[in-house]
Amino acid sequence: MISLKNFGLLFWKRFSENKLNQVAGALTYSTMLAIVPLVMVIFSIFSAFPVFNEVTGELKEMIFTNFAPSASDMVGEYIDQFVSNSKKMSAVGIVSLIAVALMLINNIDRTLNSIWHNSQSRSPLSSFAIYWMILTLGPLIIGVSIGISSYIKIMFEQSEHLSLGLKLLSFVPFLFTWFIFTLIYTVVPNKKVKIKHSAYGAFLAAIFFTLGKQAFTWYVVTFPSYQLIYGAMATLPIMLLWIQISWLVVLVGAQLASTLDEIGEQIEQ
């Protein structure tokens, strides 16, 4: 049985070897390039299903709040404008935007597989099928989840005897974040990952992500140095900083799950 100290040393060694700080920066750059194509694809899929019209507003709020907690309104206006402009694009332009979105998913795939030290790659056809499924089915799954949460919330609000349930409902965003991270850490690596290890890494990432979002919002509001220095352009560095923090949290959770897997394999041997 490995001690907590040795586990911490191994975790930090793998974190340094994988250069996760630099990787988070690279993913931030990729995300900034792909955010408009991703949002365009997501809301195009939603518009094709009238049943999701009622939850589109909630989905927008969730996306904008997670990408820029302190500047969600301004970011929302910009992205609405970008998506509106994308509707005027030609077929070639739309294909190009989708390709950029798929490239981001490919970068995430390669990054997580490198954390698990997995050199075995999928075939191009298999990779494309998985990326396309994520790009198309992902928004539908999120939409269904938001719709169910909204329905349950309305049901609790209409009942005077379910106030406890309404309070418990406040944990749904955290549980949903935990579930998404667990799914990513389990499915994306091209090797068998124990779900309990994925869940441990995802739990840590979900805690850091939730607390980090609150702390980041508090810092930006309390110490508005970015607004003083950058003025009207303050949204851009704020958004860049938050996206990098978010990716670092995702990678830390992945590294924890990978380290647990590595230790488990050593014990089994």
UniProtKB/Swiss-Prot annotation:
Keywords: Cell inner membrane, Cell membrane, Membrane, Transmembrane, Transmembrane helix
Any one GO cellular component localisation term in the record: plasma membrane
S-S bonds: none
Keyword Transmembrane: yes
Compartments (UniProt record): Cell inner membrane
Ranges annotated as spanning the membrane: 32-52, 89-109, 128-148, 168-188, 203-223, 232-252
Predominant location: membrane
Membrane topology: Multi-pass membrane protein
UniProt similarity note: Belongs to the UPF0761 family.
Protein name in the entry: UPF0761 membrane protein NTHI0384
Species of the source: Haemophilus influenzae (strain 86-028NP)
Lineage, uppermost ranks: Bacteria, Pseudomonadati, Pseudomonadota, Gammaproteobacteria, Pasteurellales
